C-alpha cells in the first residue's frame, strides 16, 4: 500500500512538472516573415479582383433604388398633382422632390459615375438613367426660366441650373453633361452647359491669382483637394 502511495505521489509531481514546461512557441505571422500582400485580411469582405457579374449583383439594386427615388416629374405644389402639360407651369409648379436633388453637386458626381459604370459593364441601364434626367432637365429650362421672369420665383432644383450661385451648383453637373454629350454629340444640352460655363468662367469668386475660392464658411475659403 505504501509503495502504491509512493508511486502515485511521484506521478503527481511529474504531472505538475510537465504542466509547467513551456509549450513550443507559435510562429506569429507579420510583415517580417510574411509579405503584407500575402496576408489574409481580418475583415469579411473578399479582397480579390471582382468579376463584372459579381459587382453588378451589388450595384444593380442600387440603380433600381436610385431610379425610383429621383423622379422626373413636375407637380403642383398646392395640389400635389402631376403636371404633364408644361405650358401650364406657374408659380406653384416644382420638380417632384425625391430622396436626392437632380442638379446637386453630389448628383453631378453620381451622373459621371453612372456613365463610367455603363462603359465598364456594357450595361446601357446606367447610361439611360443619366440620359433621361439630363433630357428632362433640359426640357424644363425654358419653362422654369419663364417662371422666374414672370413670377420672380423658381423651383429650388431648377434654380441651381438656371441661376447657379456657387461652383457646387455648376461644376459637377456640367461635367456630367459634357461627358454624355461626347458620347452622343447629337444631344444638345447647351442651354444648361452654357449657363454653367458662364458662371464658372465669369462669376464664381476667385482669388487675385485666379484660384477658385468661396466666401463661406469664411472669406476666401479654398478646397483642400
Tell me the role of every PLM-derived stretch.
Residues 8-10, 144-145:
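N-terminal leader/targeting segments
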Residues 35-43, 102-119, 156-158, 163-182, ...:
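Well-ordered alpha-helical segments within folded domains of soluble proteins
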Residues 200-225:
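The feature captures the catalytic groove of carbohydrate-active enzymes
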Residues 23-152, 187-190, 194-195, 203, ...:
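Low-complexity, Ser/Thr/Pro/Gly-enriched N-terminal "stalk/linker" regions
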Residues 1-7:
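Bacterial N-terminal signal peptides that target proteins for export
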Residues 149-159, 212-218:
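Short linear capping/connector segments at secondary-structure termini
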Residues 16-18:
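C-terminal motif of bacterial Sec signal peptides marking the signal peptidase cleavage site
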Amino acid at each position: 500500500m505504501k509503495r502504491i502511495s509512493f508511486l502515485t505521489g511521484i506521478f503527481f509531481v511529474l504531472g505538475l512538472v510537465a504542466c509547467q514546461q513551456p509549450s513550443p512557441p507559435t510562429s506569429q505571422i507579420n510583415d517580417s516573415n510574411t509579405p503584407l500582400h500575402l496576408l489574409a485580411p481580418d475583415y469579411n469582405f473578399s479582397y480579390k479582383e471582382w468579376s463584372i457579374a459579381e459587382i453588378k449583383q451589388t450595384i444593380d439594386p442600387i440603380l433600381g433604388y436610385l431610379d425610383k427615388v429621383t423622379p422626373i416629374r413636375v407637380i403642383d405644389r398646392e395640389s400635389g398633382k402631376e403636371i404633364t402639360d408644361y405650358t401650364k407651369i406657374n408659380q406653384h409648379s416644382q420638380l417632384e422632390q425625391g430622396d436626392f436633388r437632380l442638379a446637386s453637386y453630389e448628383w453631378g458626381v453620381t451622373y459621371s459615375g453612372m456613365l463610367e459604370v455603363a462603359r465598364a459593364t456594357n450595361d446601357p441601364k446606367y447610361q439611360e438613367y443619366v440620359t433621361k434626367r439630363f433630357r428632362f432637365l433640359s426640357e424644363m429650362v425654358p419653362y422654369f426660366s419663364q417662371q422666374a421672369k414672370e413670377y420672380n420665383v423658381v423651383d429650388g432644383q431648377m434654380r441651381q441650373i438656371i441661376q447657379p450661385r456657387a461652383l457646387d451648383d455648376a461644376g459637377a453637373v456640367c461635367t456630367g453633361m459634357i461627358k454624355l454629350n461626347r458620347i452622343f454629340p447629337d444631344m444638345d444640352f447647351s442651354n444648361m452647359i452654357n449657363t454653367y460655363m458662364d458662371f464658372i468662367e465669369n462669376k464664381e469668386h476667385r482669388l487675385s491669382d485666379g484660384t477658385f475660392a468661396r466666401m463661406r464658411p469664411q472669406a476666401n475659403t479654398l478646397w483642400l483637394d
